[in-house]
């Protein structure tokens, strides 16, 4: 998938869209060789890569650094980058400066969270030639308002509000919407009522696509294991075992061997 046109086509043909997050050059190069449709340079990188408490601490400088790294490695993939916390709630001028910074860092589109107060901003960004992905449900930048990472849309009123939000984001010009941590039946209803694709994370199997944090699906993060994550490998064990093997071989002087040494000429 090389552009937003791929998202539109996938919605029409009902081909599921696969997305993962990425924050660095090395993993981006690996992803570039896979069949993944799209990469999200998420503000979650502030937590996953930099160890910050939550995404409200991720800065625009962080996002530029990570976006540049991913763009350098994943040269054949469509890249969406998150607008970080408050970068699009101060003024239109600062919003557009942030958008420009991420696009010039290598992103092809940007993502922002929520609908309230964002609709005119989204329209302006889209009218400026930059594709926008929406994000509703459990929006991590609102963690202080939610009182933590909590499933959203569990009441009839909340579910109705989510559908209204999704429709407003579509009308504002979003080419797709992330649905995070909402009941599967609500995500299905939203998906069926939109002409743009939905990308689920903790939203069941009836969305138009799925996204996971790469380090979560590779089993690299042992401290964070939410219900919606499937570990495809135990990366933490694989890496720690490899490092421990290196340590043992170093101490036993079995590494390096002749094949790892240079000959004198």
UniProtKB/Swiss-Prot annotation:
GO terms for molecular function: 3-methyl-2-oxobutanoate hydroxymethyltransferase activity; magnesium ion binding. Belongs to the PanB family. It comes from Francisella tularensis subsp. tularensis (strain WY96-3418). 3-methyl-2-oxobutanoate binds at residues 43-44, 82, 111. InterPro entries: Pantoate_hydroxy_MeTrfase, Pyrv/PenolPyrv_kinase-like_dom, Pyrv_kinase-like_dom_sf. This is 3-methyl-2-oxobutanoate hydroxymethyltransferase. Keywords: Cytoplasm, Magnesium, Metal-binding, Pantothenate biosynthesis, Transferase. Its EC number is 2.1.2.11. Catalyzes the reversible reaction in which hydroxymethyl group from 5,10-methylenetetrahydrofolate is transferred onto alpha-ketoisovalerate to form ketopantoate.
